[in-house]
Each structure stands twice: as C-alpha cells, then as structure tokens.
Amino acid sequence: MTNMRKSHPLIKIVNHSFIDLPAPSNISAWWNFGSLLGVCLGLQILTGLFLAMHYTADTTTAFSSVTHICRDVNYGWLIRYMHANGASMFFIFLYFHIGRGIYYGSYTFMDTWNIGTLLLLAVMATAFMGYVLPWGQMSFWGATVITNLLSAIPYMGPTLVEWIWGGFSVDKATLTRFFAFHFILPFIITAMVMIHLLFLHETGSNNPCGMNSDSDKIPFHPYYTIKDILGVLLMMITLMSLVMFTPDLLGDPDNYTPANPLNTPPHIKPEWYFLFAYAILRSIPNKLGGVLALTFSILILMLFPILHSSKQRSMSFRPLSQCLMWILVANLLILTWVGGQPVEHPFITIGQLASMTYFFTILILMPSTALMENKLLKW
C-alpha cells in the first residue's frame, strides 16, 4: 500500500509543497523570509479575527471599541498589539524578501515575481485600511490625505474620491467599507500566496549562485522545515519583545486622540513602512506628478526582469552591482527617514535628491553597470 501522504488527493499537494519538495542544497537564511511571511499572514488573520469579534465599525464607537478591547477583553491588549506590531514584522520581512529577490536575481521567474508585486500592493492596501480602523487622529487624516490623492486623476478624479468615501468627506460610510475590505483582503492575499507558490514550484527555488541546481537537490523536510522553525522562533521572540516592552514604539501618539475633522495634526504621516513611498510622493511639487511617482515607485519592481542585462543571474559574483544594491538600500533608508520629517529645509532637498537617486539607480545605473561587468568578464 502506498503512503497516504503520497496518494491522498489533498495531502499529496501538501507533500509536494512542503515535504518531498526538491530544494537547492545551498539556499541561505535569506530564503527563510517566504515561510516567515506565511506565518505572519496566519498570525494576522488569527489576531484580526479575534479583534473583529469586539470591534465596531462606526465612527461614534470605533475608538471606544479599541479601548474596550485593550482594557476589558481577556488578553485584548495582547491581541491588539500583536496585530499592530505583526504588521510591522510583515513589512520588514516583505522588504527583506524583495531585496533578496533583487540581489540574487529571483525576478527572472517572471510569473512568480509579478504575482509577488501584486501581493505587495494588496498587503499595502490592507495595511492602509487597517490603520484607519481605530479612528484616531492619524487614522482619519491619513485616510483623508491618501484617498484624496485619487482626485489628481484627470476628469474622473473628484468623482472617484467621493465614490470611495461614500459621501463628501471621510465619514461613517468610509469606515464601514474600509473594515469590510480590511477583513476580506487577507483571504484574497492567501489565495494569491497559493498562486505565488504554484508558480514558484513550476521552476523550483533559485539559489545564491543563481545557477541551475537540479543536479544537487535535497528534500525540503527535514532540512528546511527545521531551518524555518528556527526563523519562526526568532521572529516570535522579536515580536513578543516588541509587544511586551514597547508596544507603541512604531505607532504614532496622535492616534491616541479620537478623530476630529475640525483639528488637523501638525504632521500627517503614515506608518513607518510607507514612509519611503510617502517621501517620494512629497518630493514632487505637482499633485498628479507625485501620485504617478508614488505608483511607479512600487510598480518599478515589475521592470526588474526587463532591465536585467547581466550574463549572470545573481549578484554574488558582481561586486559593482553589489555596491549599487547597497546604495539603493541606503537610499531607501534615507527616504524612510525623510518621510517622517516635517516639510521644510533641508528635508525637502534631501527627499528630492533621494527620490531622484532611487529611480536613477534602478533604471539607469544598475542595467548599465551589469553591461559593463559583462565587458570586464569578456562575456
């Protein structure tokens, strides 16, 4: 009799995805982030579900319901802060995961890469709408500012904004629909993750050398399951330390003030994980131009497979490209810092320079450096 693991129609799928999956023997810890993202998604759905049991999506009671969760619900404070800080962990891992893909040339798996970019957009949309739900000052004004950006779309912009708001301003209708979307999107994301994995398993994983590893594969279980468990353990230690000691470290104090449409906070800014994109948006003095730059700053990821001009897939043996990669990382950190600063000198200039460098590095410097490396290697 054949093993049930290999014959049962459902268990067979799990077996081929997580147990008997042939994996390259040399993938490093940079390949841990995929599984960590999966764990994060599961954690967010679970904590989110329990929060939704006590939350009310109404402008008059939303803020109070979050307070009620933290004060009166058994371990409500823990669930709330795990959910809020879990989102931060999610984005840290997302950025590491994407960075790994760029460094090692994983974007040459075009189907996997493009669905991954769409996943990033879906997660960003979910996080944005989740930030609106507590209905604090930054929730309300963040929602107002970001949704208002759509009014820059020629001809149909203003109508589109009012359609999204469900009225003439961010109000009860907006909060209710944002809650509905925030609840449904993670399940759509889960389906997209399955498609992401389906495409990945068509080709198999990349590896640090960027070479074909068919001649040297090992089973996913037990080698990479145990490695992933270590990653999850380290993640949980980090997350729980954050939740237990400094739960508000990454949040905004303004969000502890209930939403007030008559009082604008001095500095409107999104959560830290959107600051780089926010800095790019702010660095262009034209509304439509800013919105286009913001959109393109994320969608530029889809151009990586087209812009790849090196004869080698990975950056492991390309020191010049490695330098550019780390310049790009430093540039994004500068953008993140600038995004959290007030709009005044010298931050405006720094933001504009960093935004320009971001696009220039990806669109011009990286492809041309790769071509030069080909020449240097006489390829």
Curated annotation (Swiss-Prot):
Assembly with partners or alone: The cytochrome bc1 complex contains 11 subunits: 3 respiratory subunits (MT-CYB, CYC1 and UQCRFS1), 2 core proteins (UQCRC1 and UQCRC2) and 6 low-molecular weight proteins (UQCRH/QCR6, UQCRB/QCR7, UQCRQ/QCR8, UQCR10/QCR9, UQCR11/QCR10 and a cleavage product of UQCRFS1). This cytochrome bc1 complex then forms a dimer.
Cofactor binding, per record: Binds 2 heme b groups non-covalently.
Pfam families cross-referenced by the UniProt entry: Cytochrom_B_C, Cytochrome_B
Cofactor(s) this protein requires: heme b
Gene3D superfamilies to which the protein is assigned, alphabetical: Cytochrome Bc1 Complex, Chain C
PROSITE patterns per the UniProt record, alphabetical: CYTB_CTER, CYTB_NTER
Organism per entry: Ctenomys goodfellowi
Gene Ontology cellular component annotations, sorted alphabetically: mitochondrial inner membrane; respiratory chain complex III
Protein name, per record: Cytochrome b
Task of the protein: Component of the ubiquinol-cytochrome c reductase complex (complex III or cytochrome b-c1 complex) that is part of the mitochondrial respiratory chain. The b-c1 complex mediates electron transfer from ubiquinol to cytochrome c. Contributes to the generation of a proton gradient across the mitochondrial membrane that is then used for ATP synthesis.
Keywords: Electron transport, Heme, Iron, Membrane, Metal-binding, Mitochondrion, Mitochondrion inner membrane, Respiratory chain, Transmembrane, Transmembrane helix, Transport, Ubiquinone
Residues at which heme b b562 binds: 83, 182
Record GO terms (molecular function): metal ion binding; ubiquinol-cytochrome-c reductase activity
Sequence positions that bind heme b b566: 97, 196
GO biological process: mitochondrial electron transport, ubiquinol to cytochrome c
Compartment(s) of residence: Mitochondrion inner membrane
